[in-house]
């Protein structure tokens, strides 16, 4: 059974492991291999420790735990970082270990994230995803509407990201 709960500071190492492992499996063939090999559990742990300790950042983070209380997925976000009206919030990151994908965990994480946005007074959100990432279909299945695309550089390669948006996140919390 998978449990979804708010993240705590002590979750930083578990979140970091899911973050790094998910990048390595999900983005193989998309992001340069050297970049993926250089990802560090310790650097990601430090990053997540800082995020989870910084209350002023208003970062919303939830984790998915298995029966052994190991973190197998997480979602994080907050206010839209690039101010893309009419979107108030941004889902910055959602990752689930490959062996746990396809079990509805992603939908549950998005739902709890959207519920927290609504409690915080934010009714709309967007997210960015690599154009080559097959998970785009997941966001489309949740009703995400294509907004725009942008190019950026990572590990010496130019990649394309696409933004999906929800003008009313309440659709994500309905049964």
Regions found by a protein language model. Name each.
Residues 11, 104:
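Conserved G/P- and acidic residue-centered "switch" motifs that form tight phosphate/ATP-binding loops
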Residues 103, 120-123:
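Short coil/turn segments at alpha/beta junctions that flank glycine-rich nucleotide-binding fingerprints
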Residues 1-3:
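Extreme N-terminal starter segment of soluble prokaryotic enzymes
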Residues 52-60, 122-131:
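Generic detector of contiguous secondary-structure segments
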Residues 6-10, 17-30, 34-99, 110-112, ...:
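Acetyl-CoA-dependent GNAT
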Residues 89, 123-136, 140-145, 149-175:
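C-terminal "cap" of GNAT-fold acetyltransferases
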Residues 101, 118, 140:
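Short polybasic/polar patches that bind polyanions
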């Amino acid at each position: 059974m998978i449990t979804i709960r708010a993240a705590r500071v002590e979750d930083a190492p578990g979140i970091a492991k899911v973050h790094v492992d998910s990048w390595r499996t999900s983005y193989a063939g998309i992001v340069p291999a050297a970049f993926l090999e250089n990802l560090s559990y310790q650097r990601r742990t430090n990053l997540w420790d800082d995020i989870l300790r910084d209350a002023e950042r208003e970062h919303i983070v939830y984790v998915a735990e298995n029966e052994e209380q190991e973190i197998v997925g997480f979602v994080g976000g907050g206010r839209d970082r690039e101010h893309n009206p009419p979107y108030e919030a941004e889902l910055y990151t959602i990752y689930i270990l490959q062996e746990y994908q396809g079990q509805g965990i992603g939908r549950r994480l998005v739902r709890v994230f959207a519920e927290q946005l609504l409690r915080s007074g934010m009714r709309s959100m967007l997210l960015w995803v690599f154009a080559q990432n097959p998970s785009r279909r997941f966001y489309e299945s949740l009703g995400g509407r294509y907004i725009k695309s942008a190019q950026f550089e990572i590990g010496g390669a130019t990649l394309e990201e696409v933004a999906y948006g929800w003008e009313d996140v309440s659709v994500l919390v309905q049964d």
